[in-house]
UniProtKB/Swiss-Prot annotation:
InterPro entries referenced in this protein's UniProt entry, alphabetically: MnmA-like, MnmA-like_C, MnmA-like_central, MnmA-like_central_sf, Rossmann-like_a/b/a_fold
Protein source organism: Buchnera aphidicola subsp. Schizaphis graminum (strain Sg)
Binding-site residues, ATP: A11, M12, S13, G14, G15, V16, D17, S18, M37, G127
One GO location term (cellular component): cytoplasm
Residue numbers spanned by region Interaction with target base in tRNA: 97-99
Family: Belongs to the MnmA/TRMU family.
Record's protein name: tRNA-specific 2-thiouridylase MnmA
GO biological process: tRNA wobble position uridine thiolation
Catalysis performed (reactions): S-sulfanyl-L-cysteinyl-[protein] + uridine(34) in tRNA + AH2 + ATP = 2-thiouridine(34) in tRNA + L-cysteinyl-[protein] + A + AMP + diphosphate + H(+)
Organismal lineage: Bacteria, Pseudomonadati, Pseudomonadota, Gammaproteobacteria, Enterobacterales
Gene name, Swiss-Prot/TrEMBL: mnmA
Residues marked Interaction with tRNA (site): H128, Q344
Active site: residue positions: C102, C199
Description of how the protein assembles with itself and partners: Interacts with TusE.
Length: 367
């Protein structure tokens, strides 16, 4: 099928995935143009942000592939739609996932609309590891072939109506295959490391970054028995299930069993810890989720059973979903689950199909 009249704007990040995606689209006879999004003003964040290097890499790839590269600054929109939420949720003691919100508000809303309306594109494309399939006139989001790299977890806020204008060119490939292709076509980014950490922070320590924006109030670290064993540096620095960086070495207990964060008490500004990753105080029988999105609303009939992930790259867990109201659902796990973290997202699956998801409002503790 000749697609030379179909225009695609691909989000170029300067990485190997978007670069190979652009190459695939060119080979499939699309009219391809790239777009580099500047979502963060890095003038004061040189320690954290790699945007300048990423832009340089994107420019070099586009030059080699002979495609035009648009450069757009969405940093104001990112601050208002993503970063302010990120800070507010941390202040509430939750652990948000800004990359999911970035996909929803920036990549698949602001960028999507800019490409379709301003640049008159037929499609947008990204280097995400996910797949889109059409069946009986409807579009479905599926896991990638490379389950280790599958990014459908980050894409659950999409709607079926959007999917018809979105392309994920490498969703059917393994990451190793993508790198091999990049080498064969002579892309210098073939061996570029995958981005790590939150997009605007990079691999640096998040707590150092957050200290620039949130006033840290130190407080007590206490055991479930009420014993004070140390001081925390601000509740936003910790997440449920965390074991490293607690600074409580040498306290009494079974020295062979590590300590974990099991609760953050905002009212008393205390961090509560217990020993063992399967400690009953860390386990949950379910959760309450908010900000729900179903990719294909008409396919959802309550109650129903499916699989779910409460964090990226987690093995799917079986659960039952019950309707509470138009804004909340109750999720009950088949077996207790450790480290359910308010602020993170739970994403639902029926085998390989991503049904949608929501933000974890609260957990239903085992004890």
């Amino acid at each position: 099928m000749i697609k030379k009249n179909k225009k695609v704007i691909i989000a170029m990040s300067g990485g190997v995935d978007s670069s190979v995606s652009a190459w695939f689209l060119k080979n499939e006879n699309y009219q391809v143009e790239g777009l580099f999004m500047k979502n963060w003003e890095e003038d004061d964040e040189k320690e954290y942000c790699n945007a300048a290097k990423d832009l340089s890499d994107a420019e070099e790839v586009c030059k080699k592939l002979n495609i035009h590269l648009h450069k757009v600054n969405f940093s104001k929109e990112y601050w208002e739609k993503v970063f302010e939420n990120f800070l507010n949720e941390h202040k509430k003691g939750k652990t948000p996932n800004p990359d999911i919100l970035c996909n929803k508000e920036i990549k698949f809303k602001i960028f999507f609309n800019y490409a379709i309306q301003e640049l008159q594109s037929d499609y947008i494309a990204t280097g995400h590891y996910a797949q889109i399939k059409k069946k009986n006139g409807k579009y479905f989001l599926l896991k990638a072939v490379d389950l280790n790299k599958d990014q459908s977890y980050f894409l659950y806020t999409l709607k079926g109506i959007q999917l018809k204008n979105i392309l994920f060119p490498i969703g059917g490939l393994k990451k190793s295959q993508v790198r091999i292709i990049a080498k064969k076509i002579g892309l210098k980014v073939a061996e570029k490391k995958d981005s790590t950490g939150i997009c605007f922070i990079g691999p640096k320590k998040i707590n150092n970054f957050l200290n620039r924006y949130i006033k840290a109030e130190k407080g007590d670290i206490i055991t479930t028995e009420g014993t004070i064993v140390g001081k925390h540096n601000g509740l936003f620095c910790y997440t449920l299930g965390q074991r490293k960086g607690l600074g409580i070495g040498g306290i009494k207990g079974n020295y062979n069993i590590p300590w974990y964060v099991i609760e953050k008490n905002i009212i008393n500004n205390t961090l509560i810890i217990a020993q063992g990753s399967c400690n009953k105080r860390l386990m949950s029988i379910g959760l309450i989720a908010e900000k729900i999105n179903w990719i294909n609303d008409d396919k959802i009939i309550f109650p129903f059973s499916c699989q779910a992930k409460i964090r990226y790259r987690q093995i799917d867990i079986f659960c039952n979903i019950k309707y509470i109201n138009d804004f909340l659902i109750k999720v009950l796990f088949d077996s207790p689950v450790s480290s359910v973290t308010p602020g993170q997202s739970i994403v639902f699956y029926s085998s390989k199909i991503c049904l949608g998801g929501g933000v974890i409002q609260s957990r239903l503790p085992l004890l």
